[in-house]
């Protein structure tokens, strides 16, 4: 899964996800599904914001090409992806400037057109179930909730989807592509089901035990559960695509 994430997502998103997991003391070598989920969530937040601006008349417009002569303001402030200290600094600044009520939990975005914070959700389950979980956690009518699924479904507060249909379709298409790519690599079942993930973990450990008596030297740079994998960077630049080679038991 880690190899897939590094190949599938923009290096900047991968780096932000790594920092987020490190900040919370989580090991991406072990919690690879969480690593993939964080990258997916980050990308959706960025796609949500992409190309959306507010012009001089205060109208929301979509601009896909940079125009240096246009006096435009980004419609959305991206809060997700920042470290907690900086994220709260941005939230406090927005509240002081706009008079918005300070949220109890860090939101993902702020919409300058609608003057509201937005919580973005990406779920592998039913959208309405995840929506209710988000709503029960946030307990604030001031924060707008928008949930996307990998099956193309979505749900938003008061059925207000904020973005135009084309922008939302772009997000849904990307999520569907991620799902298809995972499925083609045999990763989707373990990603969508914790039970399947545990089965895969046991399978990896069993493979490791079978290799224990061989002469194959296993890298200690990876977590115990994933020692049968030996990631090899093809260059030192983190913006390059990760290639991986898999250690196998030698034939007897």
Swiss-Prot record:
Where does it reside? Host cytoplasm; Host nucleus
Indicate whether Isomerase appears among the record's keywords: no
Enumerate the residues marked as the site Important for efficient shutoff activity and nuclear localization.
Answer: 195, 198-199
| Keywords annotated in UniProt | Decay of host mRNAs by virus, Eukaryotic host gene expression shutoff by virus, Host cytoplasm, Host gene expression shutoff by virus, Host mRNA suppression by virus, Host nucleus, Host-virus interaction
Endoplasmic reticulum in keyword set:
no
A Gene Ontology MF term for this entry? RNA binding
The organism's superkingdom is given as Viruses
* Gene Ontology biological-process entries: viral RNA genome replication; viral translational frameshifting
Active-site residues are: 80, 108
Q: Name one Pfam family in it.
A: Flu_PA
Q: What is its main location?
A: host cell
Q: Residues at site: Important for efficient shutoff activity?
A: 28, 65, 202-203, 206
This chain's function reads: Plays a major role in the shutoff of the host protein expression by cleaving mRNAs probably via an endonuclease activity. This host shutoff allows the virus to escape from the host antiviral response. Hijacks host RNA splicing machinery to selectively target host RNAs containing introns for destruction. This may explain the preferential degradation of RNAs that have undergone co- or post-transcriptional processing.
What family is this protein classified in?
Belongs to the influenza viruses PA-X family.
- Domain description from the entry? The probable endonuclease active site in the N-terminus and the basic amino acid cluster in the C-terminus are important for the shutoff activity. The C-terminus acts as a nuclear localization signal. The C-terminus is recruited to host protein complexes involved in nuclear Pol II RNA processing.
Protein name per UniProt: Protein PA-X
What is the species listed in this Swiss-Prot or TrEMBL entry? Influenza A virus (strain A/USA:Albany/12/1951 H1N1)
